Amino acid sequence: MPTIQQLVRKGRRDKVAKVKTAALKGSPQRRGVCTRVYTTTPKKPNSALRKVARVKLTSQVEVTAYIPGEGHNLQEHSMVLVRGGRVKDLPGVRYKIIRGSLDTQGVKNRKQARSRYGAKKEKS
């Protein structure tokens, strides 16, 4: 514990909060190229084949990003837009791919929460 004299001389140093989406370099989204598209299994107690992609961003960082929604058209060399947001049951996946922008198509036959999945309004 410092003395009062030491605090007068140096003061306290503020703690710097760790950034959760460091690869975006402060941007809300970043463009990137898929280097690998594959499925992985979640941690216990969940069970599924979650669709993920390794993406090389314009910030020269390679990240693992989740592909939300049912079905996708992504393959190697697809251009994608990546945002922050982790997937709780996939360790190391801290980014999500934005559906309906660049090479990523929106989810087909989506009725609710359409804007999150890049789905157009159905013509009635």
Swiss-Prot record:
The modification 3-methylthioaspartic acid is found at residue 89. Residues 1-30, 105-124 are annotated as: Disordered. GO terms for molecular function: rRNA binding; structural constituent of ribosome; tRNA binding. InterPro entries: NA-bd_OB-fold, Ribosomal_uS12, Ribosomal_uS12_bac. One of its GO terms (cellular component) is small ribosomal subunit. PROSITE patterns: RIBOSOMAL_S12 (PS00055). It comes from the Bacteria. Pfam families: Ribosom_S12_S23. One of its GO terms (biological process) is translation. Keywords: Methylation, Ribonucleoprotein, Ribosomal protein, RNA-binding, rRNA-binding, tRNA-binding. SUPFAM superfamilies: Nucleic acid-binding proteins. Residues 108-118 have a biased composition (Basic residues). With S4 and S5 plays an important role in translational accuracy. Belongs to the universal ribosomal protein uS12 family. Part of the 30S ribosomal subunit. Contacts proteins S8 and S17. May interact with IF1 in the 30S initiation complex. NCBIfam families: rpsL_bact (TIGR00981). PANTHER family: 30S RIBOSOMAL PROTEIN S12 FAMILY MEMBER. This is Small ribosomal subunit protein uS12.
